């Protein structure tokens, strides 16, 4: 029985679990949306919520506390300048966990953990990627057309 066994051990020792959660939390704050297993998402949620609450305070002490937990200075800057102001009027509940199927290798349940209100930024990223992809495709087609035209203009057996 699991009476009074709070928290998630994730099949790791203490330092490995702490490193995993720090990496996951940093990735969530930098990317707005991360796919992971459902258990890791549930384990990371309270850490992200606490950091966003620190970001809403915005004082130097809070910034230093966040810097002690997060992996990069860029993540701290993004937390305090971009993510935390998004939730100025909200008291908690900054994340959403959406189940997304099962992992192929071991059948673990996968989920997206995402920051609420990040849909616009995610859509902009997706749109930029689609535009870049279309531009690359257009350049490739142009290069292929030029290559075919150059090949078609030369007489056969020109190497002899």
From Swiss-Prot:
One annotated GO molecular function: structural constituent of ribosome
GO BP, sorted A to Z: translation
Region (Disordered): 123-160
Keyword line: Ribonucleoprotein, Ribosomal protein
Biased composition (Basic and acidic residues): 123-141
Keyword Cytoplasm part of the UniProt annotation: no
Sequence similarity: Belongs to the bacterial ribosomal protein bL17 family.
Full protein name: Large ribosomal subunit protein bL17
Organism: Acidobacterium capsulatum (strain ATCC 51196 / DSM 11244 / BCRC 80197 / JCM 7670 / NBRC 15755 / NCIMB 13165 / 161)
UniProt gene name: rplQ
């Amino acid at each position: 029985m699991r009476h009074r066994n709070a928290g998630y051990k994730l099949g790791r020792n203490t330092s490995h679990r702490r490193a995993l959660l720090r990496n996951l939390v940093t990735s969530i704050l930098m990317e707005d949306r991360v796919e992971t297993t459902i258990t890791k998402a549930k384990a990371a949620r309270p850490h992200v919520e606490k950091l966003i609450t620190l970001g809403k305070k915005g004082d130097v002490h809070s910034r230093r506390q966040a810097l002690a937990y997060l992996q990069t200075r860029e993540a701290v800057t993004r937390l305090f300048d971009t993510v935390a102001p998004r939730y100025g009027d909200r008291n908690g509940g900054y994340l959403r966990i959406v189940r997304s199927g099962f992992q192929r290798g071991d059948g673990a349940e996968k989920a997206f953990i995402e920051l609420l209100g990040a849909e616009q930024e995610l859509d902009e990223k997706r749109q930029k990627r689609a535009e870049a992809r279309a531009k690359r495709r257009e350049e490739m087609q142009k290069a292929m057309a030029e290559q075919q035209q150059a090949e078609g203009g030369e007489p056969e057996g020109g190497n002899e």
